[in-house]
């Protein structure tokens, strides 16, 4: 598998509070709906992206796909990809996939499984990042789980 980064206690308490109270999440609160944003539109997530740029080559990033999973999960094993192009059979991946666990209170389940059998527990203030094209799965869970997915792209997404 390509690079894997797992960082606990990633943001400061102040940064966490700023994300929780920022209007971006409320204005884009439609869970599981992705949006494509410029660098300037997602300032609240710059600490995350700045870290990612230290460990992945983001020099060609032109847009950032951002969405949240709040007490939801994707069904089944999947790759993060350009969904519109996939409808016509073309498979293109982001530069990387990143998942930031904003708030987690899971009683059971909710682990992230990667194609190489890596299992990652969801933990509040944990950042997980891995390279392109990695198939992954979130197991069913009970409790609450709020994650933010930020995927940098080196091309604009199909519309």
Per-segment meaning from a language model:
Residues 1-67, 72-75:
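Non-heme Fe(II)/2-oxoglutarate
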Residues 57-159:
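Catalytic core of non-heme Fe(II) oxygenases with the double-stranded beta-helix
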């Amino acid at each position: 598998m390509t690079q894997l980064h797992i960082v606990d206690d990633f943001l400061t308490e102040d940064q966490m509070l700023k994300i929780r109270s920022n209007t971006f999440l409320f204005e884009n609160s439609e869970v599981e709906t992705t949006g494509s944003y410029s660098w300037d539109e997602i300032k609240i997530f710059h600490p995350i992206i700045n870290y990612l740029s230290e460990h992945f080559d983001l020099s060609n990033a032109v847009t950032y796909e951002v969405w949240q999973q709040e007490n939801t999960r994707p069904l089944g094993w999947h790759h993060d990809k350009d969904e519109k192009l996939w409808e016509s059979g073309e498979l293109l991946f982001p530069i990387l996939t990143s998942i930031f666990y904003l708030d987690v209170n899971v009683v059971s389940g909710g682990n992230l499984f990667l194609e190489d059998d890596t299992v990652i527990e969801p933990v509040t203030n944990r950042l997980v990042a891995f390279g392109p094209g990695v198939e992954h799965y979130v197991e069913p869970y009970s409790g609450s789980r709020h994650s933010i997915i930020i995927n940098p792209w080196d091309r604009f997404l199909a519309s």
